[in-house]
């Protein structure tokens, strides 16, 4: 059984001060693996400053790119009840329940954004969470490496909800994290304003903004040295 240590155990004492993880305020989506087969993650040996994350967000290789979400609200992050087996009215643990994650986006919600989110559904995607306390939250199953939470393929679904007389236009996104994600492996990087050095999160991840898709028109005024081409946002 997962996390069951036969013949030994874990001490239950705690230090006088323990870190707390704030509620999610943003997500950072990325593919699990790059096209070169290398896992996308953050390491304690990385210098986690502005240039590092700007490079990931603007990465020309989309398999290694980081996709920040907008501000997320009405977050529901719950793990379901465990799967058990009943024998003689005794419930035996079989496996942990699924961890589902639901959120809404109000600022910037549009049908075009719904389409952008749903394009990720069939891909092997992962997501870091960014807390209101500017922490990047992920999985530290292996010491020194913070991995994004793996998303079960084909569970990510975005639904556009039009505005009404009493409610704003918004986007609702739901997903299920992989059964391989264990809550006991959750860890995070704390933001340290003015910090320097390897493994120090020296830039506020709440400030991250994703790239914006554009539609390119027909080139005109073409010469040896220049041309003009109109570009418009897909959002109008």
Q: How should these model regions be labeled?
A:
Residues 1-102, 148-168:
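Solvent-exposed edge beta-strands and adjacent loop segments
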Residues 77-79, 130-183:
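Short beta-strand and beta-hairpin "edge-sheet" elements
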Residues 100-104, 172-176, 223-226:
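Beta-strand secondary-structure signal
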Residues 106-147:
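Short, acidic/charged, Gly/Pro-enriched secondary-structure junctions
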Residues 116-126, 188-196, 202, 236:
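Extended Gly/Ser/Thr-rich low-complexity repeat segments
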Residues 181-216:
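Surface-exposed beta-loop interaction hotspot
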Residues 210-235:
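Beta-strand-rich structural segments
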């Amino acid at each position: 059984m997962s996390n069951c240590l036969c013949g030994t155990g874990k001490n239950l004492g705690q230090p006088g001060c323990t870190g707390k993880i704030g509620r999610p305020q943003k997500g950072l989506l990325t593919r699990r693996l790059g096209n070169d087969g290398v896992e996308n993650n953050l390491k304690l040996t990385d210098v986690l400053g502005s240039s590092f994350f700007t490079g990931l967000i603007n990465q020309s290789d989309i398999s290694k790119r980081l996709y920040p979400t907008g501000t997320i609200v009405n977050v529901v992050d719950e793990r379901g009840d465990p799967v058990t087996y009943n024998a003689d009215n005794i419930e035996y643990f079989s496996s942990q329940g699924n961890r589902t994650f639901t959120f809404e986006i109000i600022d910037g919600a549009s049908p075009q954004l719904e389409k952008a989110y749903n394009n990720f559904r069939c891909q092997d995607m992962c997501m870091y969470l960014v807390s209101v306390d500017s922490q990047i939250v992920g999985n530290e199953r292996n010491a020194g490496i913070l991995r994004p939470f793996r998303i079960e393929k084909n569970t990510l679904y975005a639904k556009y909800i039009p505005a009404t007389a009493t409610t704003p236009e918004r986007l609702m996104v739901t997903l299920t994290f992989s059964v391989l994600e264990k809550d006991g492996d959750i860890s995070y990087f704390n933001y340290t304003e003015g910090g320097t050095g390897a493994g120090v999160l020296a830039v506020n991840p709440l400030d991250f903004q994703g790239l914006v898709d554009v539609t390119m028109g027909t080139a005109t005024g073409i010469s040896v040295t220049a041309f003009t081409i109109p570009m418009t946002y897909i959002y109008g």
